[in-house]
Amino acid sequence: SAASDVYKRQLYHMYDSRVEAIEFFVSENSNVTDIPLRDLKLKKHLLICFINRNGKIIIPTGNDCIQKNDTVMIITTHTGFTNLQDIME
């Protein structure tokens, strides 16, 4: 399933666990890949900080897309994210 194809690698709790920074590895294409970030229906209170693509750090704009084999770092005030699909509304 797509949910298991994008998995959490690292989780950081900050500010008394009010903020989480979560690193995801994108092992397969999913409903968040190959779509410009501006077109994704992301939850509020969430920021895609960077995309690591083959060792190159991308500070994303709305024109960037998440691709298979990327590592994506998000920061959010939400809790309980288990996969990258959880960033969607």
Question: Predicted regions: what is each one?
Answer:
Residues 2-7:
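Short, small-residue-biased leader/transition segments that mark boundaries at the very start
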Residues 8-10, 34-35:
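Glycine-rich, charged/polar anion/phosphate-binding loops
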Residues 9-27:
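Internal, active-site/partner-interface "lid" segment
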Residues 23-89:
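Cytosolic Rossmann-like ligand/nucleotide-binding regulatory domains
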